[in-house]
Structure formats: C-alpha cells, structure tokens
Swiss-Prot record:
Protein name: Immunoglobulin heavy variable 3-48
Positions of the UniProt region annotated as Framework-1: 20-44
PROSITE patterns to which the protein is assigned, alphabetical: IG_LIKE (PS50835)
Function, as annotated: V region of the variable domain of immunoglobulin heavy chains that participates in the antigen recognition. Immunoglobulins, also known as antibodies, are membrane-bound or secreted glycoproteins produced by B lymphocytes. In the recognition phase of humoral immunity, the membrane-bound immunoglobulins serve as receptors which, upon binding of a specific antigen, trigger the clonal expansion and differentiation of B lymphocytes into immunoglobulins-secreting plasma cells.
Organism: Homo sapiens (Human)
Location of region: Complementarity-determining-3: 116-117
Start and end residues of each stretch annotated as Complementarity-determining-2: 70-77
Gene3D superfamilies associated with the record: Immunoglobulins (2.60.40.10)
Subunit structure: Immunoglobulins are composed of two identical heavy chains and two identical light chains; disulfide-linked.
Length: 117
C-alpha cells in the first residue's frame, strides 16, 4: 500500500511539472490584404533553447495547418508552401521567444495562430 501511495505522489509531481509549461502568443490584429503582422510567442516552464518549435494555424471552420518550423539553434527552417516567401520564423533563445513575421498577408491567412513545441 505504501508503495502505491508513493507512485501516485510521483505521478502527481510529474503532472505538476508538465502543467507549468506555457506558450503565450501575442501580436495578432486586423490588417488589410497586403499588410504585415509580427506574432510573438513567450515560452516558460521548459528549456526553450533545447526545443524545436513550430507555428501552426487554424482557419475558421478548418483543421490545424502547419505553417513553419525552426530548429533549436535556429539554423534549420522550413515553411509550408502557402506561406513561403511571405512569412519568416525566428527565435531568440536568450528571451525564450519565438516569432513569426507575416508579410503580404492574404484573406486566406485569416486564422488563429499557435506556437507549438
């Protein structure tokens, strides 16, 4: 019985650590077609510099769509064909932050954008 209680306690501790991970996006807004926006994602609760990061988006009534990827060091970057040449992903490991510069915005870029590990 005592071993069982210890196991439950250990699981609770691990779940508590997981719950401290936070990714908070900001920078959205309304712009005209052809305009620009810069999204930011502030990370906390984990070693940001050790993780590859992504931007994904969800247009109204649609599923999740992957937008862009950046390696932990920032040396490797990929984009979805739909945003290539218009969007730029970057990161600042010293500030635990991820960015997405979006230029030449189109109506079809309308979506909720999320950063993801």
């Amino acid at each position: 019985m005592e071993l069982g209680l210890c196991w439950v306690f250990l699981v609770a501790i691990l779940e508590g650590v997981q719950c401290e991970v936070q990714l908070v996006e900001s920078g959205g807004g309304l712009v005209q077609p052809g305009g620009s926006l810069r999204l930011s994602c502030a990370a906390s609760g984990f070693t940001f510099s050790s993780y590859e990061m992504n931007w994904v988006r969800q247009a109204p009534g649609k599923g999740l769509e992957w937008v862009s990827y950046i390696s932990s060091s920032g040396s490797t970057i990929y984009y979805a064909d739909s945003v290539k040449g218009r969007f730029t992903i970057s990161r600042d490991n010293a500030k635990n932050s991820l960015y997405l510069q979006m230029n030449s915005l189109r109506a079809e870029d309308t979506a909720v954008y999320y950063c993801a590990r």
